[in-house]
Regions:
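Non-catalytic, conserved peripheral segments adjacent to functional cores
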Residues: 1-106, 125-127, 132-184
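Conserved metal-binding segment of the jelly-roll/cupin
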Residues: 103-125
Length: 184
């Protein structure tokens, strides 16, 4: 497993070693030992989620507050997405900064988004199957959202002019970073 550091030290890209031949391919998609060594702490995942989206669907920027904060290990198993993590920890030197990565069925990369970050993605291909592990259960009372196009954050979403953007009503009503309930 190749661990790729991003501009925000806590957010990591996991790139598996893929072994292929005429029959297909094999790779180890998750190893608790490798993962915990890379993130520098013991992490326990309690829930796996799976979503399907069409091109232009933008989901996010979502997070859960304490005591239900979630870390997520995300990957795209069909198609391609642009995946984003935004640091929303007020005490962090990277507060308000974002990192993005293209995750696809082809590159098989995964992105680790720790607790204290908002997460979102945009579907870049006609069909996307997106799966992720979460460190805490879904808790609607702790769920919050930040608007996807907040100018203070300035996410450079790719291909915005290439397709019709599709967002949920909840995502359209999300707060700006300045007005959101955040981590300390």
């Amino acid at each position: 497993m190749n661990i790729i550091k991003t501009e925000i030290p806590e957010v990591l890209i996991f790139e598996p070693r893929v072994f292929g031949d005429a029959r297909g391919f094999f790779f180890e998609s998750f190893s608790s030992k490798v993962f915990n060594e890379a993130v520098g702490r013991q992490v326990e995942f309690v829930q796996d989620n799976h979503s399907q989206s069409q091109k232009g669907v933008l989901r996010g920027l979502h997070y859960q507050l304490d005591p239900h904060a979630q870390g997520k290990l995300v990957r795209c198993v069909e198609g391609e997405v642009f995946d984003v993590a935004v640091d929303i920890r007020r005490s962090s030197p990277t507060f308000g900064k974002w990192v993005g990565a293209v995750l696809s069925a082809e590159n098989k990369r995964q992105l680790w988004i720790p607790e204290g970050f908002a997460h979102g993605f945009m579907a870049l291909s006609d069909t996307v199957q997106f799966v992720y592990k979460a460190t805490n259960y879904y808790a609607p009372q702790s769920e919050r959202s930040i608007i996807w196009n907040d100018p203070e954050i300035g996410i450079d979403w790719p291909a915005l002019g290439d397709c019709a953007l599709s967002l949920s009503e909840k995502n359209l009503q999300a707060h700006t970073l300045a007005n959101a309930e955040l981590y300390k």
